[in-house]
């Protein structure tokens, strides 16, 4: 499927993008294009990977010309460029709109223009019943992707545009695990926003598995969700304290801007039509048009009153969470650095 193809990763130097890049570095792709704004991160990856197949392109998804040029001759696109920190998006909503909505529209439009065969865009659990700017922008990104998937020229070209939605990615940049570990190492209290707040626990490898599954199995306009266990923030703090044999106090600081008590990966309305694929849910796009009368005779899916969220998924206790944390390279490295 990838032999002699050209792949473009937007946001290719971020936590997810660089994980995906390392996965593909030794594949039989003809070329991998990394499109991002940060020349320092690009240089670091260039030195680390030393791979002639990887082409680093400086550019911003907000600039249609630069992304359109970068997409010439591309077969597949993974769109991982985003502003993803919830509090900073709350303070700078227009910046989030420009990158996550307008920038993503540029990526999708360039993909249509360049007749790209497969596009996978990355969304988040925060896009379901969104209450914060980041979630709202990602929710609209999903709508833009589905809109492109139904375009006649995309269908004629055999193009598949789809979305993946994932929960809290453990150890990604700016997330809670690196924060707690840094607080443990410097002897500070662990700042817990709300002890009973639950979050899905996914590794970076899980998120790559999700996009690869979507890439292989998606129909146009699909949204894919990976099932994942969850834990409370307090359980996470206790598990890390035990792993690092630390006695830092836990300090409750209250929810930050735009935070929810739990996150939803699949809304009630979506669960009524979602297909359970074992480890994943597939949410098919609604391709009805605005002439609703012709659909009245069909058998409609009944709406459900149960969503799939971090409150009703499998809940990890401290022992189970410690076991999961020990599988993460970042946690292993941090533990080793302390023991040396």
Annotate the PLM regions.
Residues 79, 83-139, 147:
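Conserved Rossmann-fold NAD(P)-dependent oxidoreductase catalytic core, especially the SDR/UDP-sugar
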Residues 10, 71-80, 121:
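Rossmann-fold scaffold of SDR-type NAD(P)-dependent oxidoreductases
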Residues 56, 96, 119, 161-164:
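Hydrophobic/aromatic anchor residues within beta-strands of the central parallel beta-sheet
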Residues 55-76:
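Conserved Rossmann-fold cofactor-binding substructure of NAD(P)-dependent oxidoreductases
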Residues 113, 143, 147-340:
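Strand-loop microenvironment adjacent to phosphate/nucleotide-handling motifs in alpha/beta enzyme folds
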Residues 36, 57-58, 98, 194, ...:
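Conserved residues in the N-terminal Rossmann fold of short-chain dehydrogenase/reductase
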Residues 28-41:
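Conserved glycine-rich Rossmann-like NAD(P)H-binding loop of the short-chain dehydrogenase/reductase
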Residues 5-27:
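N-terminal Rossmann NAD(P)H-binding glycine-rich loop of SDR-like oxidoreductase domains
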């Amino acid at each position: 499927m990838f032999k002699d193809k050209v792949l473009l990763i937007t946001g290719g130097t971020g936590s997810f993008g660089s994980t995906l890049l390392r996965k593909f570095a030794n594949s039989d792709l003809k070329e991998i294009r990394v499109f991002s704004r940060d020349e320092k991160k690009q240089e670091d990856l260039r030195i680390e990977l030393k791979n002639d197949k990887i082409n680093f392109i400086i550019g911003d998804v907000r600039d249609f010309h630069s992304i359109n040029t970068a997409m010439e001759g591309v077969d597949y696109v993974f769109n991982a460029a985003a502003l993803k920190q919830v509090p900073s998006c709350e303070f700078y909503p227009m910046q989030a709109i420009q990158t996550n909505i307008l920038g993503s529209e540029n990526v999708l439009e360039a993909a249509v223009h360049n007749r790209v065969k497969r596009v996978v865009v990355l969304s988040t659990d925060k896009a379901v019943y969104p209450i914060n700017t980041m979630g709202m922008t990602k929710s609209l990104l999903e709508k833009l992707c589905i809109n492109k998937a139904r375009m006649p020229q995309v269908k004629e070209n055999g193009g598949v545009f789809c979305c993946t939605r994932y929960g809290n990615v453990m150890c990604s940049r700016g997330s809670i695990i690196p924060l707690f570990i840094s607080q443990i190492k410097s002897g500070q209290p662990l700042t817990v926003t709300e002890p009973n707040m639950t979050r899905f626990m996914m590794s970076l490898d899980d998120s790559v598995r999700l996009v690869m599954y979507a890439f292989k199995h998606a129909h146009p306009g699909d949204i894919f969700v990976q099932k994942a266990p969850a834990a409370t923030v307090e359980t996470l703090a206790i598990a890390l304290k035990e792993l690092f044999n630390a006695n830092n106090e836990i300090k409750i600081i209250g929810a930050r801007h735009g935070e929810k008590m739990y996150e939803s990966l699949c809304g009630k309305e979506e669960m009524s039509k979602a297909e359970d694929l074992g480890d994943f849910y597939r949410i098919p796009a609604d391709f009805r048009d605005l002439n609703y009368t012709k659909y009245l005779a069909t058998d409609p899916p009944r709406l459900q009153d149960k969503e799939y969220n971090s409150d009703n998924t499998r809940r990890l206790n401290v022992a189970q969470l410690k076991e999961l944390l020990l599988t993460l390279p970042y946690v292993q490295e941090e533990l080793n650095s302390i023991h040396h």
